[in-house]
Amino acid sequence: GLACGALLKEAGVIDHWKFAHPKDLQDGLVEVNEDDCLANVPYVEGCGLWFDHHSSEHERLELAGKYKGESRTAPSCARIIYEYYGGKERFPQFDDMMEAVDKVDSGHLTIDEVMNPKGWILIGFLMDPRTGLGRWREFTISNYQLMEKLIDACRTMTTAEILALPDVKERIEVYNEQTEKFKQMVSQYT
């Protein structure tokens, strides 16, 4: 969601956004119209643009020719948006982010990248809802608010600058506190 949002904003496609759970979209709990651009979530009839990288959506809905945008198998939805709007020529500042997003989303990470994440991979882990950091409620701002803030940060700041933001640093602290427990669990059960 974060990389897709940063790319879409940089391309001038969006000026506001909402992060929604895929099931909420499928169940019709989120209103969608022709002004909406959906990314990395299931297709909803009536949206203006749709980008996805999950082949299951085409199989489920037989969508060929029914939408504007692009959907195909790729390492990440961000990769599809990146290429759709011009790739490296349009987004030269996003090379490192794109490499990390593709790795994190597709799971093509080395053991060292999982055990000792740095840079964009660490940012990806911190912002992925599956990491579970959202259940710690003592953060200054919510994970949702941080996601909103980071859409612009990803476009204008280096990874070092992003990782130094107070709202990110407090999440790194919690993440690192949990690292030893994680390492013990991985070594015990793999």
Model-derived features: where do they sit?
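Hydrophobic helix-and-loop "lid/oligomerization" segment in the mid-to-C-terminal part
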Residues: L2-A3, K9, I14, L109-T190
